[in-house]
């Protein structure tokens, strides 16, 4: 894509490395901060936290175990941000890795179009008893719900936490299960 055809994104995207940054800036007109992979420094976390107080922060990390660890670490420090998830199977045909730099352009555009707003508050939007009544201990139901919400698959307890981070109520979750 040439400079004129890049898609404008408001906010700042957080990704893992320089090759991810280069790929994202080929496609999008956006500011990017890199975590330098698992070498995530306290200074970088503080920078991202400060930026999140003034503008939109979008976490677009690799869909591998390392990306999940980095996302989890950042989530501990942020209160308002967006999560983007890319399907690991959306990588380029000859790619050996499954990082953002190796993803199909269409998958990255879709991930940003389906970004999920996260706002942490002290109150739970769905209670554990309500969650249990939805029978989400069934893996098929969790997969259905995650697909309908454009989220990656989460285990039982992780999904409960994510639903609260998304501020989804019992009624919201019920609608997405139909």
From Swiss-Prot:
GO terms (BP aspect): rRNA processing
Compartment(s) of residence: Cytoplasm
TM region positions: none
Binding sites annotated in the UniProt record for Mg(2+) 1: 16, 62
UniProt cross-references to InterPro entries, sorted A to Z: RNase_M5, RNase_M5_C, TOPRIM_dom, TOPRIM_RNase_M5-like
Name of one Pfam family that matches: DUF4093
Keyword Metal-binding: yes
Keywords, in A-Z order: Cytoplasm, Endonuclease, Hydrolase, Magnesium, Metal-binding, Nuclease, Ribosome biogenesis, RNA-binding, rRNA processing, rRNA-binding
Primary role: Required for correct processing of both the 5' and 3' ends of 5S rRNA precursor. Cleaves both sides of a double-stranded region yielding mature 5S rRNA in one step.
Protein name: Ribonuclease M5
Organism listed in the record: Mycoplasma genitalium (strain ATCC 33530 / DSM 19775 / NCTC 10195 / G37)
Origin organism lineage: Bacteria, Bacillati, Mycoplasmatota, Mycoplasmoidales, Mycoplasmoidaceae
């Amino acid at each position: 894509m040439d400079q004129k055809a890049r898609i404008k994104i408001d906010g700042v995207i957080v990704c893992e490395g320089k090759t991810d940054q280069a790929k994202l800036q080929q496609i999008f007109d956006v500011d990017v901060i890199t975590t330098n992979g698992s070498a995530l420094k306290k200074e970088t976390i503080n920078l991202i936290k400060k930026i999140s107080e003034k503008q939109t922060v979008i976490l677009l990390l690799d869909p591998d175990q390392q990306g999940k660890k980095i996302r989890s670490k950042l989530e501990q420090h942020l209160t308002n941000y967006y999560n983007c998830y890319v399907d690991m199977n959306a990588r380029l045909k000859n790619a050996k890795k499954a990082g953002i730099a190796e993803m199909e352009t269409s998958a990255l555009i879709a991930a940003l179009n389906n970004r999920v707003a996260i706002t942490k508050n002290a109150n739970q939007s769905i209670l554990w008893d309500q969650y249990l009544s939805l029978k989400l201990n069934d893996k098929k139901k969790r997969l259905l719900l995650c697909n309908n919400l454009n989220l990656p698959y989460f285990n039982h307890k992780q999904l409960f936490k994510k639903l609260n981070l998304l501020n989804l109520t019992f009624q919201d979750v019920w609608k997405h299960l139909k």
